[in-house]
Structure formats: C-alpha cells, structure tokens
Amino acid sequence: METMTSKAGEERRSVTAPSQPYDPAYDPLKSTTPGQGRDYAPTYWIGTAGEPPADDGPVTQDMDVDVVIIGAGFTGLTTAIFLAQEYGIRATVLEANRTSWGCSTRNGGQAQCASGRLKRSQWIERYGLDTALKLHAECVEGMETFKSLIKDIDCDPQPGGHLYIAHRDKVMPVLEKEARLLRDVFDYDAQILDGDTVKRDWVGDQEAAGAMHEPEGIGIHAGKLAFGYLRKARALGARVHPSSPVQGWETRDGVHYLKTPGGTVRARAVGIATGGYTSQSLHPQLKNRLLPILSNSIVTRPLTANEIEACSFRTHQVITDTRVLRHYYRLLPDNRLQIGSRSAITGRDAPQQKYEDVLVNNMVRKFPALKGIPLDYSWWGWVDVSHDMMPRIHQPDPSETIFYALGYGGNGVMYSAQAGRRLAQWIAGDGRQLDLPIFTSKLPFPNIREMVESQAFAPFRRFGQRFLYRWYYLKDEVL
C-alpha cells in the first residue's frame, strides 16, 4: 500500500499500488479470473491522467454490507454514485485489479448517443418503431445523464457532435437514408456532408466520400473521467476496494457470500459491472453470454502546425468511419492523433506487432502526411459485445438479488453512465417499471442469424469470429 500527501498537503491519502505487472496477453475466455492487483495497461489515458485518487484498500476481513458492485470501472462507479445520490445506499465496490483497470481506461474516449452496435434502422427492423423510438429516447436521456455527471469533472471534454465518415462512395446512399430516418422519424438533426465539404471544413481523411454529422458527441479523457468518478463515488460514501477479486460466490438464504483473497463479503444484493473483463467463472448467469472482442488503439506524438494543416484537421470532434470493423479517431486537446480499430482475436495473439502495424497503415491511408510519425502510446483492450449486439441492464432471475449491466459493444463511454443509473434503479428495487427489451431480457447465448440460440454454440464463437472478420473485410474493402 502506498501512502502519499494530497496536493493541498492537508490530509493523508492512500492509493493501492499494483502487486502484479500488467498482463498484455490476458484473455477473459481463457483466464479463470482477471488476476489480482494487476497494473494498468500502458495507455495514453493512464500516462497523462496524473496520480490515481485514494481508494479504500483491499478487503482485509469478513464484512457485512447491503450492496456490492463487482467492477470499479465507469459502470460500477456510476452505479455507486446513483445508489448514493438517488436512494441513499452506500455501496461497496470490489475491483480485482486497480480501479478502472479494464475497459474504462483502454477505450477511445468517445461519448456517442448510442449503445450496442445496431443503427436506428436496425432497431426498427428488430423491435418495431414504437420500441425503437423509446430506445432512442433512452440514449438521448443517457447523454444528458452523462453531461450532468461530467460537468464538475476535469476530463478535457471535446463537445460538438459526432462525424460519421463514409469510407467508400457506395456507402453514401445508405448513410443518406439513415440521416433522413434520424431527422424525419427520430427528430434527431443528422446532416449529410459531401466529400469535398468534409475534407475542406472538417478533416482531410483521404478516404472520405462524405459523412453524416450527428449533433451529440463528446470526446473525453478516459483516465481523468475514471478518476473523477472514483472521487465522486467515495465522496458520496461508497467504499472502493481494489485488489479484491471475487474468487468464489455462494448464495444462501438470500445472502450472497463473495469470497475475496482478504475475506468474505456478505451482501443482500450484487450488481455486476465487469464489462469485457467478465470471467466465465464469475457467476453461472453470465457464462457464455458475452463475446469479448479486442480493439487496438494508438496515439501519436503531438502533431506540428504543418502536420495539422496537411491533414486538414479543422475539428476536435469524435469521428468514426462506416466500416463494420470501424475506425474511431480524433485530434486530442494536445494535438496528438488517437485512432483505434479491431485487433487480434485471442489475448495470446494481441501483443503481436502486426496488429499495431495494420492500424498504423490504416492511419496513413487516411492521412498520408503522417507516414513515419512516431507513436507515443499503443495498447489494446477487451470490448464486451453481446450476441445480439445490444446491451442488457437486467435482473436475470427474479428470485435472486443479482443484477448486471453489460454488452455495450464499444459504445459504453456515454451509456455506462445511464446504465449505472438503471443498474442502481434495479438494485434499489425500482427496476420493474423499466420495459425496454434491454431491461426485460437476459443476455442471449450465441446464435445463428438470431434464429437459433444455444449455449452449445459457445465453443465455436471464435471460429465464427474469424470467419466474420474475413467477411467484414471483404464487405468493407472489396465488395
């Protein structure tokens, strides 16, 4: 345990130091647990966020609490915040490694008005118009929840919207149709830009055939946001225990016995907020219900004024392209370029240099002036994707006080705030009024074209993923 003086020098505070190094090959489908006390991944967010805030240290004895949240990332910490603010419940948050060690400090820092991986038109196809409109309202409300949470957190916000770039001419008719739908049906002011306008007034992405601009979208510093959530949760009375993985779980007479290395925590209710780092063994309700997918990210050294001009960067807004295996990127406040996309399929393969090389080549394809630019940061992380591409904030068994918020599919920076509010609502006994499919149904098992769902398909998930990646590449680049 490290102890240090606060900036004001008026009080002592403790930050739990790592006891194990970062594991670059960690794989949630192969590893029994995410480890204990592991250090952060070497991300830009961690490298520039400053010293982590104080925490409550590892669990060191048996204890009785009302509510346990498993996972101290964006979702777990916002759940603790809303439990305290809206219900007067002081949660105990258990984290296996360092606080916000997983998804929350390995993402691209893009807060978009979305969750899951489906477009609004796909919502209509799956759920019907009425439910699609309600899902959109949930995302719009979620963006307001997010804005309210971050207004007093110094997380380098870059507001202004989201630029969705068509990477090929053939994509433009589809993008134009989606924009009309957003305007006419969802009353959401999405505007179409032609390729020349994008390159002249927004960004000189050489692939841009046009773009759709959405009014909602904020770039944030993920590390500063995570640390801000931690400070806020603890100020409201939550206790946050890093280096305290749940290594065993029994439920007897309505009480959950959560075994950690330092003691057993007994709780009346448990919320699960473990994201892409959910181990298969955590609880039977979660086994085989997520497909963790790796995403790579790189950050360059700060661009010079000449490089910024050569790339025609006129915006700091968040940007993605229309590939199925999409790229997400933006110019950061310190004028570095951050860009991310798909990575390896297994944790064992993730450290291979070829995945960084592919991302660098794709960056140069978009911005030829950046060929040879040094990278200051390179990392990868696991994204929690559900088998139907939509999140769930749900109580899987009405007879058990177990709840989860999972499956954001790479759109969790914003929606984790709303999911935290909804998870708190469930835990506090107020969740029965939530009637959208993401609240009323379990995370599904693997399926074949959403027609046949079965846990028996689970061993073949990564075989299917390899096939889909090849198909998506052909769809994105060739066909």
PLM region spans:
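Helical element adjacent to the flavin cofactor pocket in flavoenzyme catalytic cores
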Residues: 181-183, 206-268
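Dinucleotide-binding Rossmann-like beta1-alpha1 core, especially the glycine-rich loop
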Residues: 114-197
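C-terminal catalytic lobe of FAD-dependent flavoproteins
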Residues: 7-8, 12-14, 345-471, 475
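Extreme N-terminal leader/targeting segments of oxidoreductases
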Residues: 1-67, 85-86
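N-terminal Rossmann-like FAD-binding beta1-loop-alpha1 element of flavoenzymes
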Residues: 65-93
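Active-site substrate-recognition segment that forms the wall
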Residues: 109, 144, 152-159, 246, ...
